[in-house]
Every structure is written in C-alpha cells, then in structure tokens.
Amino acid sequence: MNRLVVIIATLFVPTTYSATGDSWCYHDPSCDDTTWSTIASEHCNGSRQSPINIVSASAVGDETLTAFTFTKYGDNSTMNKIKNTGKTVKVELTSGVQVTGGALSEVYDSLQFHLHWGNGTSVPGSEHTVDGTRYPMELHIVNAKSSHNGNTTTAVTDSTGLAALGFFIEAMPGNATGSPPAWNTLTSYLANITLKDEYINITHAISLDELLEGVDRTKYYRYLGSLTTPNCNEAVVWTVFKDPIKVSQDLIDLFSTTLHIDHNSTSALMTNVFRNIQPGNDWVVTTQGRPASGASTMCSSLGLMALAWMLLRV
C-alpha cells in the first residue's frame, strides 16, 4: 500500500461531536471518564447516559422492532478515509449510505464508524456489556436523521437525532489469522495512521456488509441513550446487535499495539478506549417479540396467593 499520510486540521464527521476538544481522555486520571461529568457537566451528568449493561432477561418484548433496510451497505466503495483521532480509529463514509426500519422514526444517514477496544487479550474493551460480559471490541456506526441534512450540531439537540448501531467483536476460535478478509484489509491501513490526526484514503474495495459478516441484523436490543464521549449528548437511539462479529485475535491485537494517542511515536499506545458502564437510571431496554404479558399475569397471581396466605394466618 502506498503511504499517503496527511495531517488535517479540519474535522470530517466528528466521532464525539465534542466542544471540549482535547480536554477529555481515556488514559489519564486527570481527564478520564471519571472526570467527564465535570469536564462536560451539561450532559455527562444526565439520566440516560451510555453505555449500559444490558440484562437480557429484563429486555421487554416489542413487536415494532422489525428488520432494518440498509442502503449501500453492500457497496464496496463507500469508505472514504480512515483516521487516527488520538482516541479511536474512525472511518468516514461517503454520502448515500443509509439505514431505516427497525422502528426508527425516519431515514438516517450513515456518517461514519469507529471502534472501541481494550488491551489485547488482557483487557476486553467493548463499551456495552451483556449480562456483565464485556467483549474484546465494539464497532459503532453513527447515523443522523436525514432531516438534519448532515448537520450534527442540530442532530445532537434532538432527543432521537442520532442512531448508533453497536456491534460486538470477539475473537475467532482456534488459531485463525488475518481473518475475515475484509477486516484484514481494513486493519492493513493502521500502519499508515499510527500517530494522532494521521489519515489515509481507503483505496481497497471494502463494504460494510463484509465487515458485519455473520451478524443476524434482525436480532438486537434497543434503548434511548447518549453519546459515549463528551459532550455525552442524550440524543441517541441505540441499537446493540446480539450476534458478535468474529475477527481473528491477531487483527484485534493490532488496534492496541499499533496506534498512538499523540503526534509522536514516543506517546502512549492507544489502549482501553472505552467508557465505563453508567449507573442505572431505569432504562427500558427492548428487543424483538411480544411483551411478556404472561409473566406479569403470573406475578400478579403469585402476589394474590401470597396475600391470601397471609390473611389466613391472621
């Protein structure tokens, strides 16, 4: 691959939509996520903060959570640039990539995707957890309502202005390396963006569908939450897919062993780039299926039986 590295000053589709710039971080106690409620207090102290631990048994059935329609996710020329932001790896998407359905209120434009990870096999780094389990990585596709015309400044002021598609990533079993091919191609660009603000044009044919191979995109969890980085705007319809993407461990390890958080190679490697689980605020997490009316009826019946037993003992 030709090394065409450019350092840019202008922003394309921001990952964080943050007004606080470099004032927040993951790696330093003076600016890590324990301080964000002070750094960006307007939203990071909110009542619908993300990420969350999803308790699968508590997810409420919702028959409106139908299948999505993905536009241009199969197009292998929609990935424009890949960039080291100093906090993640972000891939900018070309116009026309969209998602609708899945009980979303309108068509959403897919703007970019980025990733969260820990530190190789020693620290898993997904943001969301399911029943307390944290996956090695998590991919987020960030989408904005088409009615905002790509204006993320207005989108973050709309309680459902953004839709985030979250995909867990786990290691393939066995000793596979360099797999799947699409991920092998994507991660081959990391060597060209080792330092903060470096980016390179993506010239290989890669589609979103190829990166999401093996995921049943009809099975997911849904809740209303926030951006997981400052300013933590509570403007996100979260969809977290149940099936993980399977990637060979050697490719997962590249993220925590190749990228640096600053503009020089002596700066720290980019590890543990995820926000910790946020305190419970009575989120309603839904999933496909009918509401568990039978379960509530059973609970009511058991309650009446208990009351009757107590009255008999009086």
Each language-model region and where it sits:
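Alpha-carbonic anhydrase
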Residues: 2-314
